[in-house]
C-alpha cells in the first residue's frame, strides 16, 4: 500500500521542554514507500589472509567491549532521584475513553479487526484520550530509560498534530499511538518552527520544498501489555497507509527516531556506521543539520578497515546483542523503518 517515497528523520523521542535533560542519540530518516557463524560465513567469502586479519581485529574489538558490560552507565533518567521523577498520572476512566472513540466520525476510523481499532483525532476531539496518550508515552519511554520525568508526556506540539491511536476492543483500553504532523498545514500556520523535527535538526527551505506536502511522524509507543505482540505496530502502520489513501497528496513521511541512552557507545557507533554505509541519503542529508551533532571516534574498526562494513541488518543486530548486557539488538523502530525502505539523513544528540 505504501508505494510512495517515505522520508524519515531520526531524532530524540523526548518532550521539547526536556531537551537538556535526556541525552539520547537521534537519527534523521526518510522512506522510499551476527551470530558468530554469520561473521565466519562473511569471513569465508574472499581472500583468506585479508579476511583473517579483518575478522580478528573486528572480533577482538567487540570482545574487549564485552568485558566491560557491567560498567555501561545507567540511562540518565534512571539515575534521577525519585523526587525528580513525578508519579505517573492516574489512568482515564475506560468508559470515558470508549465514549470518545465511539464518538469520532466514521472517516477517522481507519482499520478495524476483531481485536483492535485504529483511528485518528485532533486534541480537541479527545480530551480523555489525550490524557491517556500522555500517560502511556511516559510509561513506555521510562521503561527504556527515557521519558520526560513528568506525570504526562505531552508538549506544545500536540495541539497542532493529529494523533493516530490503536484501541484494544477486547480490553477496552488504549494500546498504542503515533503522532502525525501534516507539514504543509503546520508550516502555513506556524512556519517551520512549528515542526517538532526542526527543534532537533535545522531543515533547509530546499528540504521542505522537496518533501512538502509531507507527514512528520514521531512519539510512537505501544502499551507494555501489548509490546510482545507483532500486531500492534503492524496495525498502526496499516492505519498510516489508510490515512495516506484518504489523503493522497502526502507523498513523503519523515520524522525522528531515537537510540536509547541505555545502549553502549560502542553499539551506537556500530549502528550509526552501518546506517551511514548502507542506508544513508547523502544528497538530501546536505539540507539537514543536527542542532547537536553526534560525534563518534573514527578509530572504531569496521570489518575491512576495513573494506567490508557489515551490510546485513541481522548481522549488525547480532553483533550489538553480543555487546549489550541485556542482549538487545537494533532498536525495534529502526529495524521496522529499514524493512520499509527508510534512508537516514542525520544524527543528533
Task: Report each predicted region and the residues it spans.
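Short, histidine-centered active-site or binding-site loop motifs used for metal coordination
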Residues: 33-35, 122, 219-224
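Conserved N-terminal entry element of GNAT/NAT acetyltransferase domains
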Residues: 82-124
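Non-catalytic C-terminal accessory region of glycerolipid acyltransferases
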Residues: 1-86, 301-308
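Intrinsically disordered or highly flexible coil/loop and linker segments, enriched in small
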Residues: 65-69, 73, 142, 146, ...
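Short amphipathic alpha-helix that is part of the acyltransferase structural core
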Residues: 110-159, 163-167, 173-179
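Intrinsically disordered, low-complexity linear regions
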Residues: 82-91, 169, 323-324, 334
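Acyl-donor binding region in acyl/amide transferases
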Residues: 11, 128, 138, 147-151, ...
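Short, solvent-exposed helix-loop connector elements
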Residues: 43-45, 346-349
Amino acid at each position: 500500500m505504501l508505494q510512495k517515497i517515505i522520508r524519515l528523520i531520526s531524532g530524540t523521542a523526548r518532550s521539547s521542554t526536556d531537551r537538556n535533560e535526556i541525552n539520547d542519540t537521534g537519527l534523521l530518516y526518510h522512506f522510499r514507500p551476527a551470530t558468530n557463524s554469520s561473521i565466519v560465513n562473511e569471513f569465508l567469502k574472499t581472500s583468506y589472509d585479508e579476511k583473517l586479519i579483518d575478522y580478528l581485529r573486528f572480533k577482538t574489538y567487540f570482545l574487549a567491549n564485552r568485558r566491560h558490560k557491567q560498567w555501561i552507565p545507567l540511562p540518565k533518567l534512571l539515575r534521577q532521584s525519585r523526587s525528580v521523577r513525578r508519579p505517573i498520572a492516574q489512568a482515564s476512566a475506560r468508559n470515558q475513553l470508549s465514549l470518545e472513540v465511539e464518538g469520532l466520525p466514521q472517516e477517522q476510523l481507519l482499520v478495524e479487526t476483531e481485536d483492535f481499532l485504529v483511528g485518528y483525532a485532533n486534541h480537541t476531539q479527545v480530551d480523555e484520550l489525550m490524557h491517556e496518550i500522555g500517560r502511556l508515552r511516559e510509561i513506555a519511554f521510562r521503561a527504556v530509560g527515557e521519558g520526560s520525568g513528568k506525570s504526562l508526556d505531552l508538549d506544545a506540539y500536540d495541539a497542532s498534530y493529529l494523533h493516530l491511536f490503536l484501541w484494544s476492543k477486547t480490553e477496552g483500553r488504549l494500546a498504542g499511538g503515533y503522532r502525525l504532523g501534516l507539514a504543509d498545514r503546520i508550516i502555513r500556520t506556524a512556519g517551520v518552527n512549528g515542526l517538532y523535527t526542526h527543534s532537533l535538526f535545522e531543515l533547509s527551505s530546499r528540504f521542505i520544498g522537496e518533501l512538502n506536502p509531507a507527514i512528520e511522524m514521531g512519539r510512537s509507543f505501544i502499551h507494555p501489555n501489548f509490546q510482545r505482540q507483532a500486531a500492534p505496530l503492524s496495525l498502526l502502520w496499516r492505519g498510516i497507509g489508510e490515512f495516506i489513501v484518504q489523503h493522497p497528496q502526502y507523498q513523503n513521511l519523515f520524522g525522528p527516531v531515537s537510540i536509547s541512552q541505555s545502549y553502549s557507545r560502542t553499539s551506537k557507533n556500530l549502528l550509526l556506521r552501518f546506517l551511514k554505509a548502507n542506508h544513508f541519503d547523502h544528497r538530501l542529508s546536505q539540507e539537514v543539520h543536527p542542532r547537536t551533532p553526534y560525534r563518534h571516534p573514527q578509530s572504531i574498526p569496521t570489518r575491512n578497515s576495513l573494506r567490508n562494513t557489515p551490510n546485513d541488518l541481522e548481522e549488525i543486530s547480532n553483533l550489538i546483542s553480543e555487546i549489550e548486557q541485556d542482549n538487545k539488538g537494533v532498536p525495534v523502530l529502526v529495524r521496522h523503518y529499514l524493512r520499509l525502505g527508510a534512508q537516514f539523513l542525520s544524527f543528533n544528540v
